[in-house]
Amino acid sequence: MTRIILFLNECVPKMIATATILVIAILCLEWYRGWKNRQLKELKKGSRKKAHGIIFGKLGIKFVFSPWDKEGHVGIFAASGTGKTSACLIPTIRSISEKHVKSYTYAIDISGDISKNCPDVPYKLEYAPEKPDTPPYNIFAPIDALDEIEDKYEALEQLAFLLMPEKVNMNDNARFFLVNGRKILTASLIAFYPVGMDFISICERIVQSSWQELFRDIDNTGNIDAIRYINGFEGANEANTAGCKQSCDDALKLFATNGKIKRSIRRPKRGEKSVEPKMIEHSNIFVVIGEDKLSLYAPLMNILTSQLMEYVGTRKVTKNSPCILLCLDELASLHIDGELILDGVRRFRKRKCRLILLMQNTADLNILYGADVTRAILANLKYKVLLGGTGLGEPESQKYFAELIGYKDSTKHSTSSNAKQTTHTESEAKEWVIEPAELDRQGKDTVILIAADEPDGYLKLKKNYYFKR
C-alpha cells in the first residue's frame, strides 16, 4: 500500500503536468486554426484606422471590408440617391489613398462628386471634357506605342469595333448597316492614321464627306490595306452604301461635331500631360461628366473605359505591379460592350484588377446585354451589395437577390377539427430568409452584403457615409 501511495505521489503530478501541457497545446492549435481561417477569409472587420480596400459598411463599431490586395469583383445595386458613391465608392477610394497602399483607381465620376470628396488622393489625374483646361485624352496613344505597322492596323480595326459595337437583339437589317459601316470606319482609320491625322480630324473628314468623296480620298492615299475594306462596296446598291456610311456617321457624330469633345481629345503637345490607358499604372484617374450629359457623352465614356479595360486585359503583371480598381458608376449608361465586361469579371483577377460595377438593378443589365450575358456577369461578381432606401424597385431583381440569400427551415402548424376530435399537425417547410419584396424595406441606412464566404451567405450592415466620420 505504501508503495502504491509513493508511486501515485510521484506519477500524478507528472500526469497532471502532461495533461495540462496537452490541453494548452490543443487550445493553441485551435486558436491558430481560427487565426489562420480569419487570415484566409477574404472579408475583414476592423477599426477605421485598419480598414483599407473596398469598404462595404459598418457592423457595430467595426468596418467590414475586402482588403485592396485581395480578389473578387463587386456589384452595387440601388436606386439613385441611396449612397452608392457616398457610402461605398468615396470611403473605398479614401481608404486606399490614406493607407498609402500600392493601388490606383479609375472612376467614372458623375457630376464630379467622387473627385471633389477625395481631395487627398495622390497622383490624381482628372479628365473633365467640359472644362477648358482639362488634360487631353489621347485615343491614339495605345496605337502610337506599337512598333509594327501591321500591329497598328490591327489596333485601328479593334478601335473601330469599340466605336461601333453590336447591340443585343439587333435585327439583320440593322446588323448589315452596322457591320458595313464599321468597314468604312476601319478603312478611314487605316488610310488617314499613317499620314499623321489625329482622331478628331479623321472623324471630321468622315462625317463631313459624302460616301463617294470619302471613298475617293481613301483611294487617293494608295493604302492597299485600307482600300480592301471598301472594295466590297463597288457595284453595290448606292442607297445601301449611303445607309452604311450613315451608320458610321452616327457613331462618330459626338467626336466630329461637339466642340468640347473635339478640344479635349487629341495627342498632347510637347511637355503636356495627357490621359491614356497606361497612366493607370501610376495615377488615380477620374473621368468627370455632368449628370445631364451622361446620355450625350455615352460614346465617349464607352471608348475611354473600353480602351482602359483592353489595356488591363493585356498588362504584364509582376509581384511589384500595382493593384487596379475600376469603378464604373451608372454602368447601364456607359454602353460598354457586354463581352468586354464579361471578359473583365472573368479574367482581371490574374491582372491584379478588381471591378466595382454600380447600377440600379439587374434589369438594366438584361436590357443592355441580354439574359445570358447578364447571368454570366452576375455569377462572376463575388460580392453583391444592396443599399436600403428606395432600393431595387424591380420584382425580378428582388427575387434574384432573395434567392441568393436563400431559405430557412421552418415548422408549420395546422389544426383541423370535426365533431369527434381536434387534430394538430406539424410539417417542415422552407421560407425566405428575406422575402423578395422586403429587400426594399430594410431601412434607408441598411446595407445587405451578399458574400458566399460568410456563414449565413450574407451580412446586414449599416451604411458608412464619408461625411459621417
Predicted regions mapped to residue ranges:
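Compositionally biased, intrinsically disordered low-complexity regions
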Residues: R48, I55, L59-K62, T390, ...
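Conserved ATP-driven motor cores of ASCE-family P-loop NTPases powering translocation/secretion/packaging/pilus
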Residues: V345-R347, R351-I448
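Charged, amphipathic alpha-helical linker segments immediately N-terminal to NTP-binding catalytic cores
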Residues: R3-G53
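P-loop NTPase motor domains
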Residues: E30-W31, K36-K44, L59, F65-C353, ...
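Low-complexity, intrinsically disordered/propeptide-like segments
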Residues: N9-C11, A128, N361, N464
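Short secondary-structure capping/turn micro-motifs that flank functional sites
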Residues: I16, D133, D364-L365
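Extended hydrophobic/Leu-rich segments
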Residues: I4-C11, M15, L146-I149, S417-K420, ...
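Class I SAM-dependent DNA methyltransferase catalytic core
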Residues: M1-R3, L449
